[in-house]
Amino acid sequence: MRLTGLILFIAGFHVHLLLIKGHAAGPRYSIAGGGGNFLCLPDNPQWKNYINGHQHTADISGIEYELFNSGRLRNNIFSENNNGGNPLLDKPAPCAVCYVGGRSTILMIPAKTQCPDGWTTQYAGYLGSEARANGHRSSYVCWDEAPEVAAGATAQNQALVYPVEVICGSLPCSIYLTGRELTCIVCSK
């Protein structure tokens, strides 16, 4: 993926704009619980409150390509031209989130505390999901930083939400510190 800063061009009457350039991330393949969808984490995360180290939470890791060029596991149907012809196997995957003008959009941005310029903040909070130890997955969602309580019975343990912590490795450890809880923001335009 060749991402060289801000992309702005006109296609008909719509403006296309690069909002996030970053690292593809998701649940660890070897863990049964936690989040169940892929996200694009920005190159420049923003932190708020966090507890260093691992707690009873969900986690998120960088996505690597699992694309074999030969052998019985051969499954690579992708061009490697953008990688200098080098194999993609076990390499971290980049990502991008773009905006197409002229359409109503609501966007959840993980690892950010502020919306892009020209966007409206709906709410800010922390990334949440099912816990990694609970044996099943749920979507990563942005949970309001000041949650409210609904009517209903308590302590039923039927569906649960936990903060999501970073696991670095495929995510660069210099900016994504293992054990930190991820922020998020929901923006509209």
Language model features by range: what are they?
Residues 4, 11-177, 181-189:
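Folded, disulfide-stabilized extracellular/luminal domains of secretory-pathway proteins
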